[in-house]
Amino acid sequence: HARLTAAVAARHGLGCELVLSKLVPRTTENYTENGNVLLMRNFGAKLHILEPGSDSKAYARQLMRELRMARRKPYFIPFGGSSVMGALGYVECAREINSQLAAQDLRADQVFCTTGSGGTQAGLVAGFAAAGSTARVQGISVLFPQERIAPVVAGIANGVLMMLGHSPQ
């Protein structure tokens, strides 16, 4: 997600400051200086790489204050792009899945997806609900325990439903 954000910012001539947390316990130079890190730097992004356990949200809030004081106009994109706005693309994904199922005269009882920061699952939940589908979206968490990610998914999904003019679930 961060790499794509840096690429789009570069393409449109926008500055990009990325607040990243060290979630993977790898410290070799090959890991820390190549791949996505190298690409993000090549796109001109300024990287703020925080140690494990750091409060990245507080850091980002402070960085945004500093950028505003410097007369810049920062726009906050949360971890993984998981927000109501970020989940809207997966509403369209749910519509596409429903369309493909209907074209084959099929019905889904369950749809499975991986869940990291919650946005993909939330968008699918909202998309299927908005379409009146009874398919249950099962997220397989790759990052957080269920009790931590479930309320995040529900909050984003309900925000999407309200944005689309539907009642939250």
Feature names for model-found ranges:
Residues R3-E51, E147-A157:
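Active-site-proximal loop->helix
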Residues L23-Q104, Q169:
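Small/polar-residue-rich loop-to-helix segments that shape phosphate-bearing ligand pockets
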Residues D105-D109:
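Short helix-loop-beta connector
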Residues G132-Q169:
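Active-site/ligand-binding loops adjacent to catalytic centers
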Residues H1-T5, R11, G116-L124:
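Short glycine/serine/threonine-rich phosphate/pyrophosphate-binding segments
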Residues A7, R11, S99, A126-A130:
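Short, well-ordered alpha-helices that flank and scaffold nucleotide-derived cofactor binding pockets
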